[in-house]
A protein has these predicted regions:
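Extreme N-terminal leader/targeting segments of oxidoreductases
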Residues: 1-4, 22-24, 376-378, 383, ...
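N-terminal glycine-rich phosphate/pyrophosphate-binding loop and immediately adjacent elements
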Residues: 2-112
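A conserved FAD-binding loop/helix module that cradles the flavin
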Residues: 40, 400-422
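Helix-rich C-terminal "cap"/substrate-channel and partner-interaction subdomain
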Residues: 95-122, 318-379
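Active-site/ligand-binding neighborhood in enzyme catalytic cores
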Residues: 101-214, 366-369, 373-376
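A glycine-rich dinucleotide-binding beta-alpha-beta segment and adjacent secondary-structure elements
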Residues: 156, 160-172, 306-308, 316-321, ...
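Mid-domain catalytic core of redox enzymes
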Residues: 193-197, 216-328
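Hydrophobic, well-ordered secondary-structure elements that form the walls
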Residues: 244, 284, 333, 349, ...
Length: 423
């Protein structure tokens, strides 16, 4: 019998498993899916150190291309590119980048700790270290629509549209929805000043091959209000006094746990966690590599907002927001806004592509739960579950639906493992 059974749907489950094993727990990993070699998101240094790994972290450069606008890791190159559209915006870009970087650093520190509570004094002290102006910036920025934030700073439509599109990626909200400025900050955490696209790393490849059991979990066994292990679809039982689930809270608590073990009010709240699919992901295999690494088609904030208007009524936008990242001749395309099951249009992207050899499409919410401000920090995914522990004895959650959420690779698993060790 193991001390811990980890249902590993991704990176976070493996991170939790290895940290618990390093502390002497007997861990069995049930690996439901193969890990991708390339993982998108910032790998916090405490996570890499705890795992004893040295992942290779890369940012595309330029990290954003929107028509003739290119934004680079080199601040001055970005300034010169912006100057072609607006000398005023070019002058403001370094100040904007530094202001956002200061706020992003605060989030980066918060993300490798349990979610802060409203009465958490250490959180209050970290915020106070920003100084009066920094505190005002943070409190004003987090609940803002990203369109208002960008309108405050810039005038060029192409710059505002591209940044706004990144802020609402995979979110069923538009750029004029409250709290979307938080998303721009979230994906800036851990990045160099002036870079608002998550990095990619090879941490998935480094963690490969460490799984013990491959198979699909059919149910989590519960006896007298406490977990006793998991049962696979094959009928095999994997016993353990603690179960850590890297799959979504909805699947964990509503599908894998038998009805009756969860309070009806909490079950209802779990069923209402927003995890709507609003983007279609298309993997294109091209005859040759395109002449760009990233490409964003979002010419203005109004364009992004109109695309969102379509999905509100369950229509796929005919002029969607498109974000593409090329890795040689393989291109990952996100087409937003497309309701789950809708058919995306790639017509706008076609002029920028060499001939397509093959394409594969995936729908759905890739992050288990939408990363909106009301489903973040101490409310992610629900206040009752924000500490990774469930009401069922020995059952913990560590997936991307948990704090801090998508874009911070391994942090949910890291925080969950530390919470288990403290329990």
């Amino acid at each position: 019998m193991s001390d811990v059974v980890v249902i590993a749907g991704g990176i976070d489950g493996l991170v939790a498993a290895h940290l618990l094993a390093a502390k002497g727990r007997r861990v069995t990993i049930v690996q439901e899916e193969a890990l991708a070699e390339r993982t998108v998101g910032w790998v916090p240094p405490p996570v890499a150190r705890a795992l004893g790994l040295d992942p290779v972290i890369k940012y595309p450069d330029p990290w954003l291309r929107a028509g003739p606008l290119e934004l680079w890791q080199d601040m001055q190159r970005s300034v010169e590119s912006i100057r072609r559209f607006s000398p005023r915006d070019a002058g403001k870009w370094p100040e904007f980048s530094e202001r956002m970087a200061r706020l992003g650093k605060l989030l980066a520190r918060i993300y490798v700790k349990p979610p802060p509570s409203l009465v958490d004094m250490s959180f209050a002290l970290r915020v106070r270290r920003l100084g009066r102006r920094g505190m005002e910036d943070l409190m004003r920025t987090l609940p803002m629509p990203v369109a208002e934030l960008l309108d405050d700073w810039f005038e060029a439509d192409v710059l505002k549209g591209a940044l706004g599109a990144l802020a609402v990626a995979d979110l069923q909200q538009g750029v004029r929805s409250a709290g979307t400025a938080f998303r721009l900050l979230h994906f800036h955490a851990g990045s160099p000043a002036g870079v608002f696209r998550p990095a990619s790393s090879n941490i998935g490849a480094l963690l490969r091959g460490r799984s013990v059991v491959s198979g699909k979990v059919a149910r989590i066994a519960v006896r007298a209000g406490r977990v006793s292990g998991v049962v696979l679809e094959s009928g095999e039982e994997v016993a353990g006094s603690t179960v850590v689930s890297d799959v979504s809270p909805q699947r964990t608590l509503l599908d894998l746990v038998e009805p009756g073990w969860l309070d009806p009010d909490l079950a209802r709240a779990v069923g209402h966690i927003r995890s709507r699919g609003v983007a279609a992901r298309v993997r294109l295999d091209l005859e040759r590599a395109p002449d760009w690494q990233t490409l964003t088609l979002a010419p203005s904030l109004d364009y992004v907002e109109r695309a969102y208007d379509d999905v509100k009524y369950r229509r796929a936008s005919t002029q969607p927001v498109i974000d593409a990242v090329a890795d040689g001749a393989a291109v990952d395309v996100s087409v937003q806004y497309v309701p789950d099951g809708g058919s995306p249009s790639l017509a706008l992207l076609a002029p920028h592509l060499p001939a397509i050899k093959a394409q594969r499409m995936v729908h759905g919410q890739p992050h288990q739960a939408e990363l909106a401000l009301d489903q973040a920090l101490w409310m992610r995914p629900l206040p009752e579950l924000a500490g990774y522990r469930t009401p069922i004895g020995g059952l913990w959650l560590c997936g991307q639906a948990m704090h801090p959420g998508a874009g911070v690779v391994g942090a949910s698993g890291y925080n969950c493992a530390r919470a288990i060790l403290r329990a």
